[in-house]
């Protein structure tokens, strides 16, 4: 079968062709089984990466117009030589917490030294974030976004959750929404100390006045459904209230223990259940039978020396898996999707193909997007060049800065 894709797009004035690509990862069903549109990686089947050797891609405006073999590339006004490098879709980081101030180095140092630490965890970041100016919060956010972009991330989701007052949660979302459309209201991160004796009153705030202030600035609503945070009934009330305001649900689920989070996520057709470390067979079956994506966050397990989620179990059951950084100052202070890919392959039972698909097409599925996460005609021209001939090097050479060039919306940005 010819690897050239015929499309309704033709190379137009101002279009660009990138040629001499050693291996182009398309995530296209035309080049393997599975696709970002089906949101399924078919475990045990042919790779869905749709890999084209000696490939070319044509970009017209902000979109992919053509993909295929270099020898069959149409003429364009501009030509870029990839120099025998691999090209992949830009990473889709579908879970991060980037609007915050301060850090928690003391907590990390104590944890790595085996000492107990009781200085506040999330509450430490809440205090620092509340005290920070808008300018400081935006400067921090753009710094971490630039870090991520340099490592190949072209789409990201980020959450509030370090304000926990009406004013501070709305402020965080306003700042985030200036940089991404994928903004999540996480007023239900923890119950703040001033509501410790009356968590029901805080749930009422999260589903009432705070929701009213935050909904205009967000696409998603999230809740930390876990012992010590919000139980299943509270999480249901929060997500249902958000959905009534037009926000789509996501759930921090089953990170620290078995619980109702995953089942609730599937029941409410949440786009994603995130963490998914402690799963029953019923949880796995529910994820495999529904649209909810299991978003795995290996940076958290790495940073906390916790039990790894079992990606192999989820994939073999037919669940859709995404990989994301969970970038936050407490439990996963990394903006590097390549690092998370290496961890997933080394410690979570994923193949290099599965891990890359999950960090691109899987992330797109977790955001219910069909215009990103793959390099096929009509998709956004978001892509990363690797200083390597194959995408496998992302897992094969952990810690090496392999991303050498990044394009977003058809323009080189790094």
Curated annotation (Swiss-Prot):
Which residues are involved in binding Zn(2+)?
95, 97, 252, 326
**Which reaction is this enzyme known to catalyze?**
4-imidazolone-5-propanoate + H2O = N-formimidoyl-L-glutamate
Q: What binding details are noted for the cofactor?
A: Binds 1 zinc or iron ion per subunit.
Q: Where in the cell is it found?
A: Cytoplasm
Q: Return the Pfam families for the record.
A: Amidohydro_1
In Swiss-Prot or TrEMBL terms, this protein is called: Imidazolonepropionase
Q: Which organism is it from?
A: Streptomyces avermitilis (strain ATCC 31267 / DSM 46492 / JCM 5070 / NBRC 14893 / NCIMB 12804 / NRRL 8165 / MA-4680)
Enumerate the residues binding N-formimidoyl-L-glutamate.
162, 328, 330
For binding Fe(3+), which residues are annotated in this chain's numbering?
95, 97, 252, 326
Pathway(s) where this gene product acts: Amino-acid degradation; L-histidine degradation into L-glutamate; N-formimidoyl-L-glutamate from L-histidine: step 3/3
Q: What does this protein do?
A: Catalyzes the hydrolytic cleavage of the carbon-nitrogen bond in imidazolone-5-propanoate to yield N-formimidoyl-L-glutamate. It is the third step in the universal histidine degradation pathway.
Q: What CDD domains is this protein classified in? A: Imidazolone-5PH (cd01296)
Q: Which UniProt keywords apply?
A: Cytoplasm, Histidine metabolism, Hydrolase, Iron, Metal-binding, Zinc
Query: Needs which cofactor?
Result: Zn(2+); Fe(3+)
The family annotation for this protein states: Belongs to the metallo-dependent hydrolases superfamily. HutI family.
InterPro entries, A to Z: Amidohydro-rel, HutI, Metal-dep_hydrolase_composite, Metal_Hydrolase
């Amino acid at each position: 079968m010819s690897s050239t894709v015929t499309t309704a797009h033709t190379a137009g004035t101002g279009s660009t062709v990138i040629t001499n690509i050693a291996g182009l990862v398309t995530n296209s069903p035309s080049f393997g089984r599975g696709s970002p549109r089906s949101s399924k990686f078919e475990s045990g089947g042919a790779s869905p990466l749709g890999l084209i050797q000696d490939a070319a891609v044509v970009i017209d405006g902000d979109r992919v117009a053509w993909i295929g073999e270099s020898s069959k590339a149409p003429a364009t006004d501009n030509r870029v030589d990839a120099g025998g490098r691999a090209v992949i879709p830009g990473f889709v980081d579908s879970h991060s917490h980037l609007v915050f101030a301060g850090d928690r180095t003391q907590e990390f140092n104590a944890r790595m030294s085996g000492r107990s630490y009781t200085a506040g965890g999330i509450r430490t970041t809440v205090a620092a974030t509340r005290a920070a100016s808008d300018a400081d919060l935006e400067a921090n956010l753009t710094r971490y976004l630039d870090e991520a972009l340099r490592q190949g991330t072209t789409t990201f989701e980020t959450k509030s959750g370090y304000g926990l007052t009406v004013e501070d949660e709305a402020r965080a979302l306003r700042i985030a929404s200036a940089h991404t459309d994928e903004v999540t209201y996480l007023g239900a991160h923890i119950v703040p100390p001033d509501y410790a004796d009356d968590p029901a009153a805080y749930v009422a705030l999260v589903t009432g006045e705070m929701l009213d202030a935050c909904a205009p600035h967000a696409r998603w609503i999230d809740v930390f459904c876990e012992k010590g945070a919000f139980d299943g009934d509270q999480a249901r009330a929060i997500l249902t209230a958000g959905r009534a305001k037009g926000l789509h649900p996501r759930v921090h689920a089953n990170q620290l223990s078995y619980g109702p989070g995953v089942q609730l996520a599937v029941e409410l057709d949440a786009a994603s259940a995130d963490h998914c470390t402690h799963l029953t067979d019923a949880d796995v079956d529910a994820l495999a039978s529904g649209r909810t994506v299991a978003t795995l966050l290996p940076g958290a397990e790495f940073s906390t020396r916790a039990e790894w989620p079992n990606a192999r179990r989820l994939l073999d059951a037919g669940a859709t898996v995404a990989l994301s950084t969970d970038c936050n100052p407490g439990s996963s202070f990394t903006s590097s999707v390549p690092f998370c890919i290496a961890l997933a392959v080394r410690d979570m039972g994923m193949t290099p193909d599965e891990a890359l698909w999950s960090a691109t097409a899987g992330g797109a599925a977790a955001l219910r997007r069909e215009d990103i996460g793959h390099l096929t005609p009509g998709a956004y021209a978001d892509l990363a060049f690797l200083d390597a001939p194959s995408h496998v090097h992302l897992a094969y050479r952990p810690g090496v800065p392999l991303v050498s060039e990044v394009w977003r919306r058809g323009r080189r940005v790094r």
